[in-house]
Amino acid sequence: MEKTIEDPPTSAVLLDHCHFSQVIFNSVEKFYIPGGDVTCRYTFTQNFIPRQKDWIGIFRVGWKTVREYYTFMWVTLPIDLNNKSAKQQEVQFKAYYLPKDDEYYQFCYVDQDGVVRGASIPFQFRPENEEDILVVTTQGEVEEIEQHNKELCKENQELKDSCVSLQKQNSDMQAELQKKQEELETLQSINKKLELKVKEQKDYWETEQLEHLKKENGHLFLSLTEQRKDQKKLEQTVEEMKQNETTAMKKQQELMDENFDLSRRLSEKKMIYNALQREKERLEGENDLLKRENSRLLSYMGLDFNSLPYQVPTSDEGGAGQNPGLVYGNPYSGIQESSSPSQLSIKKCPICKADDICDHTLEQQQMQALCLNCPICDKIFPATEKQIFEDHVFCHSL
């Protein structure tokens, strides 16, 4: 029999409460050679009855409870306990499960209640040596063996007396058992009658309960059909809501994209507007400077600004003739209209008598007015490259 994974039944029974003499171990060696299987032989006493969960364990000498076993094997139950050969039993421990040290161990027979019923003499697991082969027995050892033999004989007599007492107890228990069996048979007969009555009552109850369950099942089936219809309608409604939600999300995303694009374009327009506003303010400042310089020169020459034929029209008079696509009007319209040679009046300087003072001043004003300066990097563009100037300003906003 191989060792099983199932743990044997144990208990916390102490040594004083065990009956070591009910199972006797035979042919136990003083030591066993490691690496080999060990056969354990034992004999049941006359009044001992083995049970299915009895087991034999190998314990280290000095153990206190049966839970301290090193390994164990289940006991094989004999077929006929009355047969003499059935009293002689043996189990074989495989070498793999045996201890590997040289401590002292012993076999112990433990019943299914966790009570020790027999124990062997101590033995070791170690190789054979010359001291074990040559045995010298002294007179003292012989006397000790004889004394031990006498003690065993005395214990044997006590066991016989105990056996007689146990046999008497067994007879009494057999009579009691017979009485209990008769009572058990009576109770079993009553129990069968009750079981039959219960079965009849149960069949009647089950039939009635089955009819009730059938009716209830019909009602539940109708209710389930209606619920499935409602569920189908709800699923259709949910699907429509999902489609509407998807459409709304797409529309929202389109609006967000459009809003983002408009925001970006607005930001670009704002930057262009700010740049043109700064350019307008700069041109207005330059225009004011040029007007003051022109007035100063005209007063220096003894002329009146209002009497000049190339006066720059005011915003009220020239607004209608300007390009409607320009935000601030064309700042060069007055200069272009007054740049005709026929309208220019050449004056001589009253001090140095120079006759090119107006042409020289007018040329400087025309050069300054015909240039476009970037309000961000101050780069200068000719007035003819207005589209390039606007693209350049727009690039600063990217």
Swiss-Prot record:
Region described as Disordered: spans on this chain: 314-341
A Pfam family this chain is assigned to: SKICH
Give residue numbers for sequence motif CLIR.
133-136
Q: Which UniProt keywords apply?
A: Autophagy, Coiled coil, Cytoplasm, Cytoplasmic vesicle, Cytoskeleton, Membrane, Metal-binding, Phosphoprotein, Zinc, Zinc-finger
| Chain spans, region Interaction with MYO6 | 347-398
Q: Where are the zinc fingers (UBZ1-type)?
A: 371-396
User: Where would one find coiled-coil regions in this protein?
Assistant: 137-301
Which amino acids does the record list as binding Zn(2+)? C374, C377, H392, H396
Per the record, which residues fall in region Interaction with LGALS8? 323-333
> Where does the motif LIR-like lie?
203-206
Compartments where located: Cytoplasm, Perinuclear region; Cytoplasm, Cytoskeleton; Cytoplasmic vesicle, Autophagosome membrane
Q: Which residues carry this modification: Phosphoserine?
A: S397
- Entry superkingdom: Eukaryota
Q: How does it sit in the membrane?
A: Peripheral membrane protein
What role is this protein assigned?
Xenophagy-specific receptor required for autophagy-mediated intracellular bacteria degradation. Acts as an effector protein of galectin-sensed membrane damage that restricts the proliferation of infecting pathogens upon entry into the cytosol by targeting LGALS8-associated bacteria for autophagy. Initially orchestrates bacteria targeting to autophagosomes and subsequently ensures pathogen degradation by regulating pathogen-containing autophagosome maturation.
Domain text from the record? The MYO6-binding domain is required for autophagy-mediated degradation of infecting bacteria such as Salmonella typhimurium, but not for bacteria targeting to autophagosomes. The LGALS8-binding domain is essential for the recruitment to cytosol-exposed infecting bacteria.
Instruction: Cite the record's note on assembly.
Output: Dimer. Part of a complex consisting of CALCOCO2, TAX1BP1 and MYO6. Interacts with MYO6. Interacts with GEMIN4. Interacts with ATG8 family members MAP1LC3A, MAP1LC3B, GABARAP, GABARAPL1 and GABARAPL2. Interacts with ATG8 family member MAP1LC3C. Interacts with LGALS8. Interacts with TOM1; the interaction is indirect and is mediated by MYO6, which acts as a bridge between TOM1 and CALCOCO2. Interacts with AZI2.
Question: What protein family does this chain belong to?
Answer: Belongs to the CALCOCO family.
Protein name, entry field: Calcium-binding and coiled-coil domain-containing protein 2
Please give the organism.
Macaca fascicularis
Q: Gene name, please?
A: CALCOCO2
